[in-house]
Amino acid sequence: MYNILKKSFYKQKSLDVASSLLGKMLLFNQHKGIITETEAYIGQDDQAAHSFHGYTKRTAVMFGNPGFSYVYLIYGMYHCLNVVTEPEGFPAAILIRSIILLSKNTPHTKVNGPGKICKILDITKEHNNIDMTANHSFCICDTNLNIDDYICTPRIGISKATDKFWRFVIPDVTSLQYIDTKLVPTLT
């Protein structure tokens, strides 16, 4: 059985959530993936965040309750999955950039890039603004993996606020590609 991360987890400071999501398991329908890379987008002062320009129809979910999905389209063709963090009213979200997609066989597949994740899992804008703390088919779960070895780098693919080291990456995911699926929570 798996334990879905609760609202209290997402209500913490975004940088803490971003690093703590490493090693957690993203569940979407029948797919399971270990999160290996995240990026934080925090507040209205973060020029790279969608919330920089304030509250809009598109960014409303970022200002909402922690633990909700924020899915949007970039370049008119790639969906990106984020999860909202911080207390309601403060706009922040964590972008899921890379996962190890678990399968019955090893090695498991490394899926790097938020657009690739959404394409493979079939996550679309229809999955925007879903409470990931209450949905057993679309959530992030705790695992028994203890990830202490990660690095912080500047966020990538942006042109503003490039000085912020708000990208969190597990530098060597080789061991996760061969992880025994019995060591991670199972669906019931």
From Swiss-Prot:
<keyword id="KW-0234">DNA repair</keyword>
<comment type="similarity">
    <text>Belongs to the DNA glycosylase MPG family.</text>
</comment>
<keyword id="KW-0378">Hydrolase</keyword>
<protein>
    <recommendedName>
        <fullName>Putative 3-methyladenine DNA glycosylase</fullName>
        <ecNumber>3.2.2.-</ecNumber>
    </recommendedName>
</protein>
<dbReference type="Pfam" id="PF02245">
    <property type="entry name" value="Pur_DNA_glyco"/>
</dbReference>
<keyword id="KW-0227">DNA damage</keyword>
<dbReference type="GO" id="GO:0003677">
    <property type="term" value="F:DNA binding"/>
</dbReference>
<dbReference type="GO" id="GO:0006284">
    <property type="term" value="P:base-excision repair"/>
</dbReference>
<dbReference type="InterPro" id="IPR036995">
    <property type="entry name" value="MPG_sf"/>
</dbReference>
<dbReference type="InterPro" id="IPR003180">
    <property type="entry name" value="MPG"/>
</dbReference>
<dbReference type="InterPro" id="IPR011034">
    <property type="entry name" value="Formyl_transferase-like_C_sf"/>
</dbReference>
<dbReference type="GO" id="GO:0003905">
    <property type="term" value="F:alkylbase DNA N-glycosylase activity"/>
</dbReference>
